Amino acid sequence: MHPLTEYPRPAMRRDSYENLNGPWQYAITASAQRPADWDGEILVPYAPECRASGVGRTLQPGQWLHYHRYFAPPAGTGGRVLLHFGAVDYACAVQVNGHLVGGHRGGYWPFTLDITAQLNGTGRNSLWVAVQDPTGHGTQARGKQTLQPGGMFYPAQSGIWQTVWLERVPENHI
């Protein structure tokens, strides 16, 4: 299986971007704390419940799904570096080089974080995403996802399930 490598927003394509889809480290734990050890690799942007992810595990309520990878910022200098997530199901916190840069709630909406201040220049940078998906518990929109699929209901899908990418943009941008 190959990750989605194309630019995710063709109508707004910028030259200075870096697609972060591909293998990431992952762990499923009972804690929001960064794990000491990783369970293996997951292919982003596929949910861990999906065979294409290489994991094939269902995230249970109360569990945390952690993602980690290293990256270099997009080529160029100046401006701002934005980290885009096409979608993460359901709630997440994002750290760059050990600094919390933001988070998001809602499994179907894209979000963007400005990570410029947390970057280590042009070198190696660490990205950690902690996700929790309370499928079957809580009031979040979930469509037909369930932990007990059958009939018209299908298995829950959690975590990063849309493209993740970086862009270098001018200081003033749309």
Regions found by a protein language model. Name each.
Residues 49-56:
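N-terminal glycine-rich cofactor-binding segment
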Residues 20-45:
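Predominantly extracellular/luminal regions of secreted and cell-surface proteins
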Residues 3-11, 16, 25-30, 57, ...:
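Accessory beta-strand-rich segments of carbohydrate-active enzymes
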